Amino acid sequence: MKSPAPSRPQKMALIPACIFLCFAALSVQAEETPVTPQPPDILLGPLFNDVQNAKLFPDQKTFADAVPNSDPLMILADYRMQQNQSGFDLRHFVNVNFTLPKEGEKYVPPEGQSLREHIDGLWPVLTRSTENTEKWDSLLPLPEPYVVPGGRFREVYYWDSYFTMLGLAESGHWDKVADMVANFAHEIDTYGHIPNGNRSYYLSRSQPPFFAMMVELLAQHEGDAALKQYLPQMQKEYAYWMDGVENLQAGQQEKRVVKLQDGTLLNRYWDDRDTPRPESWVEDIATAKSNPNRPATEIYRDLRSAAASGWDFSSRWMDNPQQLNTLRTTSIVPVDLNSLMFKMEKILARASKAAGDNAMANQYETLANARQKGIEKYLWNDQQGWYADYDLKSHKVRNQLTAAALFPLYVNAAAKDRANKMATATKTHLLQPGGLNTTSVKSGQQWDAPNGWAPLQWVATEGLQNYGQKEVAMDISWHFLTNVQHTYDREKKLVEKYDVSTTGTGGGGGEYPLQDGFGWTNGVTLKMLDLICPKEQPCDNVPATRPTVKSATTQPSTKEAQPTP
């Protein structure tokens, strides 16, 4: 193994010092946090466990979302008194003591709507308001209205919302975009971070960090005022993701931060709890029991951390793609997460400059530059020719190609030559008749083949366009839009995910039935419609023939190629 150049340790040592300065100067730790609402598995203890294990409801999320009609301690005391009595009926007890979530009314769109008209008509249908909630409700109140994904997802979700907001902006609903940014800022101020969703059982983790990009989106409409207004919350979120960095030694990890042997700082997904997820209680217990060679708490943490990634679940996190109990999310450094952290640092630099703090802007630029070098060094697989995740156990970059590999292009963190290789890999290994495959592995998990997801289609499309790869970008958009249109023509709805091995079929796999609505699919579909059709002639449905790309190979990316580590 080569010895590092004499100057390298000194150079790397600057990075932690910079972070300490950023945090100390800004005092960005979350404000005095109120008492954190307890999730239902803690509030209800053995009653929650017994109800979920009895499988009273087809979906475990149903009871997790149920609202106690009185003090949970009193309900639990009554349960302990009654449970062993002759003729005790658990379902009746639940019906008496809890208000179950109502099934949403099935939305029937007006006849003859175009795809665009259908989406525009859905925004009010998917809008919710929970300024006040019941005392023991798992639902967390938010000050402004928000748009939910749809179906079983009755709350707002973090990373879903960015792609939903792209569609809201495309529809001209900037007021709703502003409301959702305000809600997420409220969560940061209240809880110190943005939880997976606005439920008490989601508070122990976050999701892919898109808040800074949401603020940047709002700034397209409101200008730098939005960047300055939400700079404190962006700083607090950054502090959450970097929490514990000041105590890390080389080769150590703490919560969401990883410090590699040469001092490079990267991030991973993490959940603060190591118990079954309340919304998937029975499934998680079964997964842990199926692998007695691992501590159950370790499996629970990795299941929860995979949920934090948004990719729940995928062969990406597993040693054996056919066995969920081999997932080890916390020992993997994800390429998409670190691309988003790079983007967060760049936006923080821009916002600091807008606020007149050039010194702090330079500090964030230094952090972004260091992370970019880390991405190029550790998250590029030179043998395969694509970006990939880094394995903390093997100390090597992994071999699997996934749609997450397009994230460095999406945030303009990729070297030009590597972006070109990514375009080739994407077209060769991931592009299918109905869009971009999530991976090329068929595991039965929903974040694997043959499923394609709207956010990943948009990340790939935008990322490839950033580097002048307009033909491949158009192929992805065209194939996915055709899939969405064919499904809509037949079923009059948009869905959460699609089978991209064909067109006109919703995706499968995972822990629950296919959901419709659907927030992020609506948003990405609108963005893609406006991408493939000229502005002077916007299209309301997907055209019958694929549009040509004008100057597809012109205007190469202005991004300078980074030196190969």
Swiss-Prot record:
Q: Does the keyword Hydrolase apply?
A: yes
Q: Tell me its EC number(s), please.
A: 3.2.1.28
Q: What is this protein called?
A: Periplasmic trehalase
Provide the Gene Ontology terms for cellular component: periplasmic space
Q: Which GO MF term does the entry hold, naming one? A: alpha,alpha-trehalase activity
What keywords tag this UniProt record? Glycosidase, Hydrolase, Periplasm, Signal
Q: Where does substrate bind?
A: R152, W159, D160, N196, R205, S206, Q207, R277, P278, E279, G310, E511
- Give the top-rank taxon of the lineage listed in the UniProt record for this protein: Bacteria
Single GO BP term: trehalose catabolic process
Q: Which reaction does it catalyse?
A: alpha,alpha-trehalose + H2O = alpha-D-glucose + beta-D-glucose
Compartments in which it is found: Periplasm
Q: Indicate the enzyme's highest-level EC class.
A: hydrolase
Functionally, this protein is described as follows: Provides the cells with the ability to utilize trehalose at high osmolarity by splitting it into glucose molecules that can subsequently be taken up by the phosphotransferase-mediated uptake system.
Lineage, broadest ranks:
Bacteria, Pseudomonadati, Pseudomonadota, Gammaproteobacteria, Enterobacterales
Q: Which residues form the active site?
A: D312 (proton donor/acceptor), E496 (proton donor/acceptor)
Q: Relate the assembly described in the record.
A: Monomer.
PROSITE patterns for this protein = TREHALASE_1, TREHALASE_2
Please give the family membership noted in the entry.
Answer: Belongs to the glycosyl hydrolase 37 family.
NCBIfam families to which the protein is assigned, alphabetical? PRK13270.1 (NF009773), PRK13271.1 (NF009774)
Map out region (Disordered) in residue numbers.
538-565
Polar residues bias locations: 548-565
Xref: HAMAP family: Peripl_trehalase (MF_01060)
Q: Which residues form the signal peptide?
A: 1-30
